[in-house]
Amino acid sequence: MKRIRDDIYATGSQFKRPLGSSRGESYEQSPITGGGSIGEGGINTQKLTTDDALTYLKEVKEMFQDQRDKYDMFLEVMKDFKAQKTDTSGVISRVKELFKGHNNLIFGFNTFLPKGFEITLDDVEAPSKKTVEFEEAISFVNKIKTRFQHNELVYKSFLEILNMYRKDNKDITEVYNEVSTLFEDHSDLLEEFTRFLPDSLAPHTEAQLLRSQAQRYDDRGSGPPLVRRMFMEKDRRRERTVASRGDRDHSVDRSDLNDDKSMVKMHRDQRKRVDKDNRERRSRDLEDGEAEQDNLQHFSEKRKSSRRMEGFEAYSGPASHSEKNNLKSMYNQAFLFCEKVKERLCSQDDYQAFLKCLNMFSNGIIQRKDLQNLVSDVLGKFPDLMDEFNQFFERCESIDGFQHLAGVMSKKSLGSEENLSRSVKGEEKDREHKRDVEAAKEKERSKDKYMGKSIQELDLSDCERCTPSYRLLPPDYPIPSVRHRQKSGAAVLNDHWVSVTSGSEDYSFKHMRRNQYEESLFRCEDDRFELDMLLESVGSAAKSAEELLNIIIDKKISFEGSFRIEDHFTALNLRCIERLYGDHGLDVTDLIRKNPAAALPVILTRLKQKQDEWTKCREGFNVVWADVYAKNHYKSLDHRSFYFKQQDSKNLSAKALVSEVKDLKEKSQKEDDVVLSISAGYRQPIIPHLEYDYLDRAIHEDLFKLVQFSCEEICSTKEQTGKVLKLWANFLELMLDVAPRAKGSDSVEDVVETQHQRAFTSGEANESSDAISLVSRQLKFATNGDVHASSGVSKHGETGLLNRDSSGKENLKDGDLANKDVATCAEKPQKDQEIGNGAAKRSGDVDERVATSSSSFPSGVENNNGKVGSRDSSGSRGILSKPSEAIDKVDSIQHTQGVDIGRIIVLGNGLQSDTSKANSNYDESGGPSKIEKEEGELSPVGDSEDNFVVYEDRELKATAKTEHSVEAEGENDEDADDEDGDDASEAGEDASGTESIGDECSQDDNGVEEEGEHDEIDGKAESEGEAEGMESHLIEDKGLFPSSERVLLSVKPLSKHIAAAALVDEKKKDSRVFYGNDDFYVLFRLHRVSAIDSYDLLSHILYERILSAKTYCSGSEMKLRNTKDTCSPDPYARFMNALFSLLNGSAENSKFEDECRAIIGNQSYVLFTLEKLIYKLVKQLQAVVADDMDNKLLQLYEYENSRRPGRVFDSVYYENARILLHEENIYRLECSSSPSRLSIQLMDNIIEKPDAYAVSMEPTFTSYLQNEFLSNSSGKKELQDIVLQRNMRGYNGLDDLAVACKAMEGVQVINGLECKMSCSSYKISYVLDTEDFFHRKKKQKKSNNLSLAKLSQNRIARFHKFLSASR
């Protein structure tokens, strides 16, 4: 076919000149420019000029001067050809139609056409197409089979299309469209296929083909003009026909011949259908004509018989002219009357009854009288019709045979109705037949769309799904029939459910994507297979050659006669020899055929040489392949690590973690929870969204070592490292109730030294790391007989958690320290010292109190360079490790110093303080002196100090005891509570929303100015903020406070008002609650979370992954392996060693992954990203340390935990956290000790106004409220009501109550105004959206019926009455 296309291009290249370029050019050109030539070389050999073309156009214009539209259509044809909208055949057909009947114009147009395209009169009158020969169809099918021998699906699809057409399941248009799609890239086949189409479709398909070719050539920018290709169409057809007959393949099977018959059938299809329609139409017309003829014949017979019966003389000759005219007019009137009756009668049944009556009368069944009675029953509703019928009946009596006329009328009408019903039935039958045919065609079409397609190519995404692997085939999918299937097989075998494959890079391995290690194994297998096939092939060829050579040597074969080399060598043997000699392979095989005796010894030697060479090569490669298998076998089985690494970074992002808990919150938000929150007074139910158990506490030590080691690698400074480790040890592990590390335990530096031979250069690092959390984690104070697991942390500096250090080292002398503290805090004004006990002054109960806030240490505490200590009375500094030791220390000091000691205060963290110096801070007048505070210290007011954990004894004799126990502590606490005041038991006084945070003690130049700002803010908080009660956070949300004031209010309790339900909901003694933001939530999640995401993949985070490694290492399989190999170290220690090697950079990721696989197995894929996870965790710790808001949350946590266990309320803590975080996410993190569990809940951001709850009040405020503000009896004279005297005079003689009742008639009063009062400042403020309501209805106007004079008199009377009342 390529040669034919080349010939086309070659022959078409001579038509190059455009038409109409100048008048001087030859007559071969057309006056139409561009688009290619219509022809070259006319009938006459003379040169044609442009003048000839213009002359022809003028002649056409003159011919159609009265038909201007035809001339315009001719010009449009030429323009379409110029624009390549039509081809030469289209031009010729349209010109023939235009110039039909004008032969001179047709002959003139032939001069512009190429040779072979002339329009003849025979063509104009009767164009016919050459009959396609059967051999041409066979040749075309063989050509398709040869063309698509490598793609049998196209060939089979083509045969199936022809088969469907032969069965009348497809029409010719569908056949052509599908074949066009099939031969889209083979235009020559499609062009040849159009020759076999019927005449009605061939021109259209030919034009469509040429347009598609033109588009393709235009896109390519090259190729022969389309019209020039059409000029040689007939010649090419003749050449292809001759060539196809000569090259016809006789090996076509019988099925192909049957399919080829459909090609010839296409030419007869249209003619058969037309003939069939014509025959059906003629048969229907014939039936109608026969019915009419029967009626006429019946009428003539009846007429003759009636004449005989009446005695008239019958004659066969034609009647007279007047008689014929009378009968004709009578018949016409009768038919018109019947039509009128049919129109007037609405019912078809009545009309049929009328005709039956006439029919019975014509047959002689009834008489005239009976006919009139029956007709009157039918036409009785229409008197005019009945009268006309009677008149017509009377006129017809004189005419020969009225019965014949009635018979004709009834028969004609009945015949027409029968013909109508017959035609209707025929149409219905035709429609039913067409519907059946269309249904069969539709069924075949539905089957046809699946023919030629494998199941893998079907789109079954919308079909019913059984399992992830099986889909139900569509109901119209053709199920192949199965032979020899028994009943047992039919009961269990499946024909309708198919396995759907999805996703792969090729068709060889569809169900799972290969990883790189599998690719290596597959390549090894391919190499091994190829080499084995080479060895087997060369071995087989050598064996055959050796056998043939032995036969030749033994002279058991004769080369004369019928010796064939194929009898001794297989095709594979010969192919092996050809490949062995490369380009000379065919020559070698020819030598074997010509002279096997001389060629075989050389070939056999060569074969054995190659066999030995390839055998040695395989032995060498076996070593390489074994190494590849050993390295990649376990890796190839790990299909999860590839996807896990991709998803792990996304799953560990803060956005993904926050989104996960939000989704869980939305799912768990039920209507019951909403009702519970409403019934609890806007308190949210405690329903955790995430819960995690800590099964192995030993893992915490490993996590601490990993974090400490990573901080040395990641953090840039030692100070930053220290802050991160303090946050981990003093907050995170305390929240999780991790036991404190004892002094002398193995430090991280020792672990790293033993595992990696690395040592830290600083000698002090070991000591400081051992004592990182001694202060905070060893001290637990016992109250009321129970051990309270308080946080035991102090608040000082920026955050007490981060700046606390327990090294116990002393870098400054005590005197220097005291001097420095005094000098630092000496600049504070007097106003700053009076904040803590301002409320006590107002109540008149000035008591001796010492600020015991956990954010400030007693005198003798050093907060420089992270050193913290406590000074006892003897001047020595130390740290008490147990509460009992603190009590013993207090007792010993009391015994030694006696009366010199004022008070011993034991803080919530177990530290002792000497208050003798604190007492000295009071001046001689008994007034409060300056209270020393550290930078950022929290200073609760004096009236709420009873909520903190204190130990004090006002009477020295009560403290003179030799032993102190937990019971003694409880008694002392009770005494302290009794002596602190009557309001010690009141709940909620520790939660004032406007108590000041505390002022920073700074040595900067602007310290006094900042101090003044803080004092101003504190004063404003006392006077305004406390008056808001539970709504102080609402005031802040509305922006009534400046931003600086909000900062100072960040860690203060919200309100003194606490819900009654909150008194019952105390915090459990073995649990710790922390309210944090997104940073803390992500920190705890990275520490330990195992959640199931949407892909059912465990997202183990640090704790869970280390725990999984330890679990796998201690599994039964690992124990069995260790029993076999007694020399192998502990698998978990080996894993930790590999992890530390990865962290310090001495091992690569691939080595670490191989080590994990060797230790744990394929389940170790979750450990491959541990380095990134630890890095992310340390970065999160750094973010928490550096963020101001996170530090404030830590301060608030310490502040709340510094209270006594009975004084801590979760609702107050939550409201304080809300003030800090505003509209940010708030998380409730609760850790319990037994069992060790972490619960996380995302709280609702409630902005609604909470209800006010009943609370207990201070006695002083109660006395003021009841005795002064709301008192009805007072020494002052009450003001008289302002009443108009003229109104009072109208009710003379009535008492005050009656007057009030009389005056309030028709008045509506609603007292709804509310006000609230601050318990500290007694300031009153009104509640918004509340008011009092007073309304008096107007009197109705009197009737207007009264006269104007009467109204005037009434008005005058009222005026005189008013004057008399005023006197």
From Swiss-Prot:
Subcellular location: Nucleus
Presence of the UniProt keyword Phosphoprotein in the record: yes
Record region (Disordered): 14-44, 212-322, 417-446, 786-883, 912-946, 958-1031
Disulfide topology: none
Matching InterPro entries: HDAC_interact_dom, PAH, PAH_sf, Sin3-like, Sin3_C
Molecular functions per Gene Ontology: transcription corepressor activity
UniProt keyword Nucleus, yes or no: yes
UniProt xrefs under Pfam families: PAH, Sin3_corepress, Sin3a_C
Polar residues bias (residue ranges): 851-876, 912-923
Biased composition regions of type Gly residues, renumbered to the chain: 33-42
PANTHER family: PAIRED AMPHIPATHIC HELIX PROTEIN SIN3-LIKE 2, SIN3B-RELATED
UniProt-recorded name of the protein: Paired amphipathic helix protein Sin3-like 2
Organism: Arabidopsis thaliana (Mouse-ear cress)
UniProt lineage: Eukaryota, Viridiplantae, Streptophyta, Embryophyta, Tracheophyta
Encoding gene per record: SNL2
